[in-house]
Structure formats: C-alpha cells, structure tokens
Amino acid sequence: ADHLPAKQIEVELKRIRNKLSSFEPACRAAGLSMRHVYGAVMKWRELFLEPDGEFNWFFKRMRLGYHVGSFMFIHAGFDDEMADLLRADGVKALNRHFRDAMFGEPFDLYYGSIANTIRTKYRSIDNRLSPKGVEKLHDSGIHAIIHGHRNLLDGQRIMLRRGLINFECDSTIDQHSRHKEGLTGSGAAVTVVHPDGYILGISTDFPYAKAFEPKRTLTALSSALTSEDKSGKPNR
C-alpha cells in the first residue's frame, strides 16, 4: 500500500487471480508438469543468476538508459521522479540506481519509479510524467526517446506523448505472442539512427521501410504553412 494506489492494487490482484486459474492448465496443454516448470526455473537461475552462470554477464552489463545526442534509449518511458534524477545527476546516476535496485527489495524495484521506466504506457495507473517533467528532460538534453514496450502490430511509429517525441520500436518476437496477436511468420525489427540525420524503421510486420527525415519533414511543413498563409485557407 506504500507503493501502489488502490486502483493499481486491484489491477494486480486481478492479474494474479487470472494467472492462478490459467497457469497450470496452460502448462498441461503444452505437455509440461509442475516439475518441468520448476526444473526450467532452476535452470534459468543457474544460467543467469549464479556467479559462474553462462549468462551471468547479462545483468552485470545491463544498462537502463543510454543517452546520446538528443536521444535517450530506454525500455518504456519516464515519470517526473526519473526526470528529476536525470536533470540533477544524468544518465550514469540512473543506471547506478537501477543496478542498486536490482540487488535490493524486488517489490521496491518493480513498483517504484526505477521500474516505471520499463513498465509505463502512460496510463492512469502508471507514474505520472507532467509537462514540467518533460521540461526537465529537455533541460537534460533529451528531446526524443527511442523505446519498445508498446505492443505494435505494424512496425515502428512516431508519437508525441506528454510533449516528448517517442520513437516506438517494439517488435513481437516469440511465436506464442505472435499467434495470440494474429501475426504470421517470424518477428524481427531494426531501427537505424543514421549519422546523416535520419531514422529508418524496418520490421517484418510492415511491407516497407519507414523513414523519418527531419530536414525533409521541416521543408515540407514550412512549404505547407507558407502556402496556407498566401491562400488564407488551411492546406490539408
């Protein structure tokens, strides 16, 4: 209750109830007993969490955010508390807080502001990002974020959220999720931020590459506004 509003608590309890009723039948349908599931979890623990595990390096090297130029690469997004942290101490402090939280109390990590950066979809139940928070991100040199987490079925897209430019680059990879979403074939995507000043989005879920060229967009917009001023009518 110290971490979550009542509305969020009810949402989480509903999710738990749904999982309790559906998990074991889903495992049986996949031919898995609870012993199989337990064995898989223990193997994952051995590979990823044990000091000599094959993939132990993954969590040691993991960074929550990567700031380059005016872009911030992040899993989902930001709230006001993280905007405060970034303006005050920068992305190194963000990553340091994340690493510390990973080895602390799991509940604090998952439901606190740090984990909001990997959970938020800017819903009413998510931590708030206000216009002042966006202003602080701008003060930190962040004018656009490149992220995943939002479920997209037709490739990358650009959105303006809370006054912050979002390049949404999620791709559904695993076959089970693709089947549930009605997607065919294998899932793959790449977003190219090119040094020449354009962004290219390529996805198996869209038949063409998507290109964002700021200079070209600005030229077209300026031309449209000039045409509108001369005619006195909106140029649609």
Model-derived regions, located:
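Feature recognizes metal-dependent phosphohydrolase scaffolds
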Residues: 1-236
